[in-house]
Amino acid sequence: MERRDLLRFAASLGAGSVVSTFLSKRGDAQTSVRYEVYGRGPALFLGSPISASNSRPGGDPLAAIRQGYLDRLTDRYQVIVMDYPPTGLAAVGAVASFDPAHVCADILAVADAAGADHFAWYGYSWGGVVGLQLAARTNRLSALICGGWPPIGASYPDMAVVAQWLAERARRAEAQLMVTFYRALEQWRDEEAVSRFTCPRMTFAASGDTITTAGQTIRIGPLIAERKADLERMGWMVHVVDDVRHDLFTRPEVVVPLVRAFLDPVLLRP
């Protein structure tokens, strides 16, 4: 039995399967990403800010949130979670090359290792941006869920300013990764790229999701609400959730029903 088939078999048993795989080289270094596979069914990546379990020193503050997603998804889906973006020394080695092309290559390598030829992607905030980049660069997405980020109309130059401001104060490689990433998107024409997407797609955000940092105001929920008709004409399912802010992803009891209402008719067979 080949390694890919072994992974599929292990996932079908319902237990988490933990595997480390070496991915594309960054200079003289290689990036190792830890990931876990749960459940059985169509493959679904839970991207950032959800990560694989037991991976952070001192415990994982998102463990209960991740479990809330897994409990509501693994009955019908093969859910893949991973430790990404890199942290610690891995982040130091990745700073110079952490652009959207490398990020997508890393994720596709994890998908290969997990035996997922095609997969749905759920990401929130930065994870939502990554989902847009995946949809623009590969035909392997079976569906896209872009949470906490507007698929069209976003100001990536403003995000580059915010990322630089945060990196100067944090003085950590993890923050510098985002500078590299968003600078690479400053000239990206999101509406032109998104208009070419063909996979089923959904976006959602909180109505009160507006972030003011470094003198920049990043409108997420209000912008999605304003562009709702445009997005729907482009084939998107759109949800704006009232009475919450950018931490909407921390409420799987609210988010997963939206995800299932979109994904189930698309990916599940009777």
List each language-model region with its residue ranges.
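N-terminal export signals
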Residues: 5-23
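Conserved HGGG/HGGXW glycine-rich cap/lid loop of the alpha/beta-hydrolase fold
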Residues: 31-89
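Conserved acidic catalytic loop of the alpha/beta-hydrolase fold
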Residues: 102-119
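Conserved hydrolase catalytic core segment
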Residues: 118-152
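Flexible "cap/lid" loop of the alpha/beta hydrolase fold
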Residues: 144-166
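Short beta-strand/loop motif that positions the catalytic acidic residue
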Residues: 197, 203-205
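Conserved loop-alpha-helix segment in the C-terminal half of the alpha/beta-hydrolase fold
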Residues: 207-237
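Catalytic active-site module of serine/aspartate enzymes centered on a nucleophile-bearing elbow/loop
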Residues: 234-270
